[in-house]
Amino acid sequence: MIIAVDAMGGDNAPEVVVQGAIKASDELGIDIVLVGDSDAISVELGGKGKRGLISVHHCGETVLMDESPLKAVRNKKDSSIRVAFDLLKNGKADAVVSAGNSGATMAAAIITLGKVEGVERPALACAIQGKEGKVILIDVGGNVDCRPVHLLQFGIMANAFATSCLGLQRPRVGILNIGQEEGKGNEQVRLAYELLKKSPLNFVGNVEGREIYSGKAQIVVCDGFIGNVALKLSEGLGESISSRLKESMMSSMTGKALALFGRNFFKRFQKTMDYAEYGGAPILGIKGVGIVCHGNSSAVAIRNAIKMAVDYVENRVLERLSRQIAEFQA
């Protein structure tokens, strides 16, 4: 298996991206192609990583984080993200991982690979740690404006991802709303509620913001604007709680003693709240495998995103997703 990694994408590229790729190749034993400026990548690579597992594919352009996604992808055909998806399209890679401009990554994926038949809008799905296991939040930034049918398709695609990659049987699907009662929310959400209710999905109704992590639903559907805000609010809250807990522990001798004896517990606690653990968000609905990472991803996050890409390919999620979309529309 070969994973193409956009080495120039992200706030800390190429250093952190290369470090994450090395971790993935060493631990997973897979082939990785680092796409980007070969000189910059070689400096960071420095002969590290298992011999023969990491290669470099040079390209001369990079899509910056603040560039217009569609314009950049169309004009910069030699950019690292565009070239990475070209490798996938031409059979020289099995998946693409990028921590770069998420809009450009989505655009490059759709332009280069195309959409699964029947899918109107590909979406970003994020598997976060809930009270009773993983919870898939979809969409987390791919589509800020959605029609009700798009939300229905998000649920169908996430259902395929959950059953194949997370091993969930008939996962519970809910729609993010401002109240639990049927009839709540704006017109978009109310109409999507009816579509989801009539679908073969295991629909459990509305999910309030405070219930995202509760386990009421294992798949939470929303538009990309709300989903991105919810995800980043959770990330910020997790960082704040971890920071304040550490400050409180270090403020007294009793706290320091507790921190010393309970450090393994606190490490596990911090791990459940660290966005690096979920690595990235798969783009569901494209004819291929693409994983979008946080722009500020650490080496651990890049490694985990690469592992997610491997799981996606090995579990044949794309085939299952295509089949479920066709079945649900029949």
Q: Where on the chain are the PLM-derived regions?
A:
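Phosphate/nucleotide-donor binding subsite
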Residues: 49-93
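Short glycine/serine/threonine-rich phosphate/pyrophosphate-binding segments
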Residues: 13-17, 78-91, 95-109, 116, ...
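N-terminal charge/polar-biased segments
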Residues: 1-5, 11-15, 31, 42-44, ...
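N-terminal glycine-rich anion-binding loop in soluble enzyme alpha/beta folds
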Residues: 15-67
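Short, glycine-rich nucleotide/cofactor-binding loops
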Residues: 5-15, 142-152, 292-298
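Glycine-rich phosphate-binding loop
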Residues: 87-106, 184, 189-195, 199-270
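Glycine-rich phosphate/nucleotide-binding loop
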Residues: 110-123, 127-137, 219-220, 224-330
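Glycine-rich phosphate/diphosphate-binding loop of Rossmann-like nucleotide-binding domains
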Residues: 15-16, 28-33, 38-42, 144-209, ...
